[in-house]
Amino acid sequence: MQLIHKGYKGSAGYDEYDKLYVGNVLGIPEIVYYEGKNLIELSKNFKEAVEKYIESKKTH
C-alpha cells in the first residue's frame, strides 16, 4: 500500500510486535513517522503528518 497526499508519498507496513500499522513520509530529508491501529487511522495520521510537515517548512 502506498499513501499519497499533496504530492508526498508515504510507506505503510505492519509492526507485529506493537500490533500497529506504521509508515514514514518518503523522499524528504527529515524523518516523519506516523502510525495507526488500522489502515483508515494510518491514512488519516499520514495526512496529518504531511500537513504538519508542510506547516513546519513555512516557519523555517
Where are these regions (language model features)?
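Positively charged, aromatic-enriched nucleic acid-contacting surfaces
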Residues: L20-P29
